[in-house]
């Protein structure tokens, strides 16, 4: 029959990892001050009175630049283990990595052509 004997540690870890955030939220709710003043709802700006509103619209160029950064950051995450194990992987892994890099170069050229890297 099926035995759960080997999963005792995992079950304990699961229960503790679920109980700690719940306990933190309940403790915060019980110990936090209950008053809502107008000053408490103000935006905090480095200890000074806020200047202007906190809700401003960012230019889309910042989002495009961040998206390109994330794409090439993920590229680094994939290529680093490949570079570490390069000698053990063989020719097929080398060709696959070249195809992966070629696809990313095409993506960079596309982003460059569309102006995602321009700040002017």
Curated annotation (Swiss-Prot):
Q: Which UniProt keywords apply?
A: Membrane, NAD, NADP, Plastoquinone, Quinone, Thylakoid, Translocase, Transmembrane, Transmembrane helix, Transport
Query: Mind naming one GO cellular-component term on file for this protein?
Result: NADH dehydrogenase complex
Indicate the transmembrane segments per the record: 6-26, 64-84, 89-109
State the similarity comment.
Answer: Belongs to the complex I subunit 3 family.
Q: What is this protein called?
A: NAD(P)H-quinone oxidoreductase subunit 3
> Translocase among the record's keywords?
yes
- Judged by the first EC level, this protein's enzyme class is translocase
As for membrane topology, the entry says: Multi-pass membrane protein
Q: Which top-level group of life is the source organism from?
A: Bacteria
Q: What does this protein do?
A: NDH-1 shuttles electrons from an unknown electron donor, via FMN and iron-sulfur (Fe-S) centers, to quinones in the respiratory and/or the photosynthetic chain. The immediate electron acceptor for the enzyme in this species is believed to be plastoquinone. Couples the redox reaction to proton translocation, and thus conserves the redox energy in a proton gradient. Cyanobacterial NDH-1 also plays a role in inorganic carbon-concentration.
Which GO MF terms does the UniProt record name?
Answer: NADH dehydrogenase (ubiquinone) activity; quinone binding
Give the GO terms filed under biological process for this record: photosynthesis, light reaction
Query: Where is this chain's protein located in or outside the cell?
Result: Cellular thylakoid membrane
List the Pfam families. Oxidored_q4
Which reactions are catalysed by this chain? a plastoquinone + NADH + (n+1) H(+)(in) = a plastoquinol + NAD(+) + n H(+)(out); a plastoquinone + NADPH + (n+1) H(+)(in) = a plastoquinol + NADP(+) + n H(+)(out)
């Amino acid at each position: 029959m099926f035995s759960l004997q080997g999963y005792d540690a995992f079950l304990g870890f699961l229960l503790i990892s679920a109980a700690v955030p719940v306990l933190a939220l309940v403790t915060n709710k019980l110990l936090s001050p209950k008053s809502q003043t107008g000053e408490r709802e103000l935006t905090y700006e480095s200890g000074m009175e806020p200047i202007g509103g906190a809700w401003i619209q960012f230019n889309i160029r910042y989002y495009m630049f961040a998206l390109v950064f994330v794409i090439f950051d993920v590229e680094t995450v994939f290529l680093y283990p490949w570079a570490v194990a390069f000698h053990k992987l063989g020719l097929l892994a080398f060709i696959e990595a070249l195809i992966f890099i070629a696809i990313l170069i095409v993506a960079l050229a596309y982003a460059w052509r569309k102006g995602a890297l321009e700040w002017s």
